[in-house]
Amino acid sequence: TNPFFVTLEGAIREVVESHGDQLISMDPANDSNTQVNQIEDMISRGVEVMFVNPVDADGIIPALDMLKDAGIPMFGFDTQVGDMSYLTSYAGSDNYNAGYVCGEDLAKKVPDGGDILVLDSPTMQSVTDRTNGFLDAIKESGVTFNVVGQQDAQGNQQVANEKATDLL
């Protein structure tokens, strides 16, 4: 379980419950089909509002159509959806810039360059944006870095550790 989402869920739960409401939280385990099924289930349970962090920015669109048809307002966080017009509101960071700042920092700290292994999660738009920002920054830095591999870590630290170990 991602510590970011554990903290975020706790904060949302605290606010929701302080108003006498109930928060139902589901983990799609980085599976877009599971997430769509979970949203269908929430609609059938009669939820009044939906907080959405898509596994796949475009893969979630059918579920957003269902939410829209059901008249359920949608609030996005952290990762944008493929069509932001579905959302009532969105709160998230500038993931591209966050990656760019990391790339700039690496170039300053490792001025001789080196080999880099990128562990990403291509279906997660927030991760893709951070990766692109990072790669653009190191390219523009003038420092020579070689991307020797790029693997899908599926947004999972254990998978990332295993892939890094295998590739090293």
Residue ranges and their predicted role:
Residues 1-168:
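A residue-level marker of the well-folded mature domains of exported/periplasmic proteins
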